[in-house]
């Protein structure tokens, strides 16, 4: 997995990026008016389609909570990123971490929320909380909208794992007859990825978020069989075994048990800094009686100490 901005990826052809060996690339969508220079380059639709056709799955990130965004604007940008069809997707809330220029600006404009300004909980600086006032949302409303977008994305595009497998499968089909040795070997690697992921398709055919997504999973499995051969007994058994495991994961998620592990904090005492001046002072303070005399034995190396000859 690698990271590439739109500006950076636009400097290479899709084949060149595929030849580099990337299976997944994380690239930012952020927002249509975020004005980040890293977003300048080829059109997103062209970039996404060309990379996916080479078997490069894309992880896209979107930010909500920019000052220009109201609910209508966020939903418009959400539809845009959904139409791009990223294999993996994240949406984070715009936040101002202490020490950043945005944090300074929010403090100066008196927009930082009191509970974070007076006693900040740094565990919330993770993209899932808003720390300053917004012209269109309260902190609670934006957090609820974030959850809504994650659910909508799942319902529209389906499980991320299957979306990744679909891209790898298309990469295999498009590159398997390439005269480029790097790309044809890439196709074989994509084929291995796809075959190894067959068991993961079974739960999606039964537990997918809706009928359309379950049909997508069945279609993908059918196409893989047609293109790469029948499913072995081992693959079938593994696939059937994943169904109850997926059911257990769904149940624990619904009940909110056995989810994120609790924070384990371990503190180690700081190592004292080396102080050469103190060491020198200690040496100078040694009593002359501890210095070995001529004819005695050195207590450090056990060698004889002789008198200097003039």
Q: Which ranges hold each PLM region?
A:
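Flexible glycine/acidic-rich beta-alpha junction loops that bind and position SAM and/or redox cofactors
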Residues: 64-72, 85-139, 162-177
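Radical SAM enzyme core and accessory elements
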Residues: 120-123, 127-310
